[in-house]
Amino acid sequence: MSRHYRLTFPLLFSLLLLVAGQAHAQKPLALWRPATPAARAAAASPEPASWFTLDAAQLATRLAAAPPETRPTEAVTLELPYPDGTLHRFALTQVPVMAPALAARFPQIRTYAGHAQDDPATTVRLETGPAGLHAQVTGPTGVHSILADPAAANRYESRQDAPVKFDCKALPNPTAQQPLLRTTASAPTAPYGSQLRTMRLALAATGEYTRQLGGGTVAGTVASMVTLVSQLNAVYERDLALRLQLVANTDLLVYLDPATDPFDNSSPVALMNANEAVVNAAVGVSNYDLGHVLGYMSGGYSGIAYVGVVCSTTLAAAGASTGSSAGLMATVLTHEIGHQLGSAHTFNGDQGNCAGGSRSASLAFEPGAGNTIMSYDGRCNPDNVGSAVPYFHAGSISAIMSKLSCGTLTANGNHPPTLTVPPSGYAIPMGTPFSLAGTGTDADGDALTFSWEELDLGNASGLAGAATDATAPPLFRSFAPQASATRTFPALSSILNNTASTGEILPLVARPLNFRLTARDNHSGMATADVSLTVAAAGPFRVTAPSAAISAAGSSTYTVRWDVLGTDLAPVNCANVQILFSTDGGQTFPTVLLSSTPNNGTAQVTFPKTATTQGRIKIQAINNVFFAINSGNITLSGSLPVELTAFSAEARATSAHLAWATASEKNNTGFAVEASADGTVFRRLGWVAGQGNSSSPSQYQFEDGTLAQYGNPTVYYRLRQIDVDGTETFSPVRSVAVPAGLAAQFQVWPNPARAAVSVAGVAPGQVVQLLDLTGRLLLQKTQSTSGPLQLELPSSLAQGIYVVRANGQSRRLVVE
């Protein structure tokens, strides 16, 4: 079965020449070895990064064995570095980006695609060429690139990709276009992905681009183009089952001299206006499906394109992208070609650049600036929603699919996924959280990823006024596709922390809500399903007791209260609710306190015997999708279902040694050993099985070999004892004093974090800074005492990746 993987690595031109004559009797050496960061790294942007030295000869040998994509079972395995310094194994095959005739003229340029063996939803595009190796890895947690250091042979940086801000002008298609004369094919309908569509891309380069970003040569510029198109195909193949392939005479579109090329590089408009004639003359109007031109812009990025001109006899090459870095231009190019393929802008904001007339009323599905490929991510302050995601919104996909009427279709042996979603028609109360849960299956066993997105169109609206706008503008931003087909609106973390989630706005007016669930198999297959809700003039539905943190005894009774506010009446018609209990702060609710009770605002429950400091109550509407969670943790006292006679923890060199004993045990599955740097937030370290049922004494021990990781002078330990029925109870907490020197290391915890972090290894007088991935300072605090510094995170901080910096050291921080 043929599969189309994501990969892009540029490799040194000389690498493949070293394949012949390699001595196979030599002991294998590591492909990557840790390297000293380049001197310029200290002044570089603060994206998490790591540095490695590449064994170029070994890489050439291993890539030479890569099979074509039609033989995926023979894929070669290659280790690739991540920004955190770890190595991950990828399965790679050769994937064409150039037409065969073009590839024959530039044999030093090779392209590959693949997926991570430990996470099939993480893909890579890799290429080798005159400038070295380049790779871009895309997964549920983001995108990072492996880049050659031009100052040192075989030294590479693995760096988290930074967002790129650019100016864009989308122009409506002025006429009804006619399809090209050859390779026509009908537009697809979802689900799709059993065929891959290949379209011929005529990509031109100005003399300025060639000199500044292509090394001044045709070969270097073609290699740069291949890198860009490989990155585009990672997205287009995944979301659109579409592959772009550089036309055979692409080298004729590469210009070396700005003084003699046919382009005016002064603006994207001038470039676009000239490109149609240039491409038609060099390639021929019937020999390409889509055209674009690359220019150079010092210190910025910009683009322009007509919308929906792909496959046309005129304006098919009406698009231009300019920038100052070839590595970052893929973001611009993906967006601009997205216009040519058929998608207008998807933002609905009316502030900043969003107020400039580029909004499309028919595709404005994203609140504020939006954050998918066709949005104005980061350019519409104060309506930026943050956390750009490199995929097409469901609305963009529909618009593009309706325009794909040309290209060559090839069966790829893939089977699209199938989807099941809740029925439409639920009425929910205003200002009340809700969840939508789907399920997906894949005949090929592919690891599916899912995204729930809103499909509502209303008046242009800022984030501040959207909740009460009866014209039904979009309220909920997009998030990167995840392994779960369930989404909670707004994010569960904001509900539990009683904070606002930027770009997730609960409606406060009666209106419709429309959503689409998209399932991707990450092999060009996709399925979609829609769900419609109605927001009624009822609610908000919320828990009023407990209204804050409380303490109670396990197995005790408690009266839960909530606001009904018309949710028991039409059109919501919620007659009964279910009351659930969580012991992990609201992350899961496995305990049913009442399976069904009238929705009358009060019910008496019996708490479980489980001891916890992180209890929460959830009231879930029966036969509906809305719910409410109480606003504070519930502490329940309890005792272990074993007779614990001893529990100790002590430091031994760099480790902590834990020992405990029981006199007897009843229904004891075992002990989860948990640790905490602050005595409040614990995480699991390991598992020790229990005796089940025993009347005899038992001895247990556990070793925590990494005391330094906590970055704190004191580490806390506890046992989470679990019954055979799943009931959990906790032991007393024990503390360990970390030996001097270990606690002085620079550390940040918890990580991921929500409301606050502790920073260790910071001396009095030193400044701790919080930065986003663009280097923008968000918060700073001076250490005034010894011990960890407590850094409160701003409530307005969006979910995503940040950097904590102090005294020249940096740590990556994930905010949930």
Model-derived regions: residue spans:
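The catalytic-center signature of Zn2+-dependent metalloproteases
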Residues: 247-270, 310-388, 453-463
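Glycine-centered tight-turn motifs at strand-turn-strand junctions
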Residues: 602-605, 681, 686-710, 756, ...
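Recognizes extended acidic, P/S/T-rich segments that occur
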Residues: 465-500, 593-595, 672-712
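Short, compositionally biased serine/threonine- and acidic-rich segments at solvent-exposed termini, linkers
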Residues: 637-743
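Extracellular acidic, Ser/Thr/Pro-rich low-complexity tracts
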Residues: 439-444, 521, 563-570, 664-666
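Surface-exposed, proline-anchored Ser/Thr-rich loop/turn motifs
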Residues: 550, 641-665, 731-762, 771-778, ...
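N-terminal prosegments of processed precursors
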Residues: 25-147, 270-273
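Fold-level signature of zinc-dependent metallopeptidase catalytic domains
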Residues: 27-38, 44, 155-305
